[in-house]
């Protein structure tokens, strides 16, 4: 995804080693309860998209569901590329007996989740997903629906304790 966001002042890349460990069957303990498949989309020699299909078996048992997840998704603004990536994961999920696809999600709730739908002009963080504004448009076009809202806030720490708080501290 680094090339996809090259020159974007709001994108904060994740740590490559951390992502490689997360995606590694040998290093990520989530694979004790999960299985995954990874797809890359190419145009010529150039990678133009990626997606992971994940089945979190433990979560499916707890919630009595047959859901696959999609995550680690990035793509250029091209309908053919997006459709091919999602068709591959949808087909894989159906072959595995899943009846729904949910995401973007990772292996566990400790992984990055969600898709940015506004605030594209705000700097991202390493703890959140950043994506281009065209991502939600492609999701809607393919018939995917938003499940819930996630909100991110900035908290500014003042250089000094505000006078009002000092007075409250004295009273207490």
Positions of PLM-derived features:
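Short amphipathic alpha-helix that is part of the acyltransferase structural core
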Residues: 1-26, 66-69, 150, 167, ...
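Short beta-strand element of the conserved SAM-dependent methyltransferase core
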Residues: 4, 39-41, 153
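A short helix-loop-beta-strand connector motif used in the catalytic cores of GNAT acetyltransferases and
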Residues: 24-43
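Conserved beta-strand in the GNAT
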Residues: 38-40, 46-56
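Structured loops at beta-to-helix junctions and adjacent beta-edge loops in soluble globular domains
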Residues: 44, 56, 73, 106, ...
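Acyl-donor binding region in acyl/amide transferases
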Residues: 60-145
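Acyltransferase donor/substrate-recognition loop-hinge adjacent to the catalytic core
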Residues: 129-172
């Amino acid at each position: 995804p680094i090339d996809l966001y090259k020159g974007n002042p709001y994108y904060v890349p994740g740590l490559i080693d951390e992502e490689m460990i997360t995606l590694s069957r040998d290093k990520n303990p989530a694979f004790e309860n999960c299985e995954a498949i990874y797809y890359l989309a190419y145009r010529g020699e150039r990678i133009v998209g990626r997606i992971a299909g994940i089945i979190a078996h433990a979560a499916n048992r707890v919630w009595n569901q047959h859901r696959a997840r999609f995550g680690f998704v990035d793509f250029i603004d091209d309908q053919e590329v997006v459709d091919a990536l999602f068709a591959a994961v949808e087909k894989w999920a159906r072959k595995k007996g899943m009846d729904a696809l949910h995401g973007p999600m990772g292996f566990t709730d400790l992984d990055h989740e969600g898709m940015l739908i506004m605030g594209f002009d705000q700097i991202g963080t390493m703890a959140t997903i950043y994506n281009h504004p065209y991502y939600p448009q492609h999701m809607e076009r393919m018939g995917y629906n938003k499940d819930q809202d996630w909100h991110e806030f900035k908290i500014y720490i003042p250089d000094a304790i505000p006078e009002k708080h000092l007075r409250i501290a004295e009273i207490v």
